[in-house]
């Protein structure tokens, strides 16, 4: 096993990303396994060792929560709203910090990783029920932000397929790893 700059590891050709983030609002919903059943839980209530719904390539699976900590204070967040491409009455939204990396797709369905602060408001994102287009981005202030560390680097938050990587978290060191991660998502 070859070790890269902490906290990124490359093992047997598979990328394992264990990254601490401080990017989600506490009321963001993730799906966890409880007694063999999938239930929604607010990020602020997710505990270490719980299993959260993630994606590896196109396969949905569960990954272990490594840590979940609260940072108190006043923080800027972006509220990102998106509507379903085929049924605009279906909408989703997520509240994240400006540096939080969004997984977006261009017109050729190529993956582009963008911090929330760089979104233009027309990007395509993937969700549990198909592709959505971002139609509104607004700012808000919240008291706490939540650091959720998960294996795999992605999660479904409020049903949106989103990274668990903030551009401020050793982003310079992660660039090669993110390129490899993007390749895995196409497989």
Place the predicted regions along the sequence by residue:
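HINT/intein-family self-processing domains that catalyze protein splicing or autoproteolytic maturation
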Residues: 5-187
């Amino acid at each position: 096993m070859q070790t890269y700059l902490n906290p990124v590891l490359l093992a047997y050709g598979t990328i394992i990303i264990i990254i601490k983030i401080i990017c989600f609002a506490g009321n963001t919903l993730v799906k966890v396994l409880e007694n063999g059943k999938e239930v929604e839980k607010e990020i602020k209530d997710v505990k270490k060792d719980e299993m959260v719904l993630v994606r590896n390539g196109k396969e949905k699976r569960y990954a272990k929560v490594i840590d979940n900590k609260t940072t108190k204070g006043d923080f800027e967040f972006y509220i990102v709203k998106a509507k379903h491409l085929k049924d605009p009455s279906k909408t989703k939204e997520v509240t994240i910090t400006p540096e939080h990396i969004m997984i977006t797709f261009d017109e050729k369905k190529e993956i582009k990783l963008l911090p929330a602060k760089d979104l233009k408001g027309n990007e395509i994102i993937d969700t549990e029920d198909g592709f959505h287009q971002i139609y509104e981005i607004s700012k808000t202030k919240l008291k706490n932000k939540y650091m959720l560390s998960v294996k795999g680097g992605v999660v479904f938050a409020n049903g949106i397929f989103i990274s668990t990587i903030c551009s401020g978290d050793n982003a310079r060191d992660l660039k090669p790893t993110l390129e490899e991660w993007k390749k895995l998502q196409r497989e």
